[in-house]
Amino acid sequence: AKRGVMLLLENHWGLTTTAANMIRIIETVNSPWLRAILDMGNFYFEEDMYAAVQTIAPYVDLAHAKTYPGGGLVYTLDLDYARIFKILLDTGFSGYVSLEMEGHEDPETAVPKSMAMLREAWQTAQE
């Protein structure tokens, strides 16, 4: 806190597999310097991943938009990015969204393709 450094907790595995666990950690620490990173592909084990996004959204300062061009390396999800972006925007999200490309396709083609798809989803979410 003295240095103005924000610590962001990512939903990944173990303790941060669920939105409820992430919120429990953030609220227990109870510091304005601890917030969340939303990895859009990592609420895979939640019963309703969009409900999980809705639950954690007020705590999110950064989001990873995970894409899977050419099929995923470990798994592939068909994510509704516009729906996720809308949830974030409706809760006042003003942070950054980064691309996390995990597909088999060559990054030379996959990254521009993913960016175009995400930009379109962002526009749709703002309508």
Locate each region found by the language model.
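An active-site-proximal structural segment forming one wall of the substrate-binding cleft
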Residues: 1-3
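Short catalytic-loop micro-motif centered on adjacent basic/acidic residues
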Residues: 7-11, 37-39
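Histidine-acidic metal/acid-base catalytic patches
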Residues: 16-127
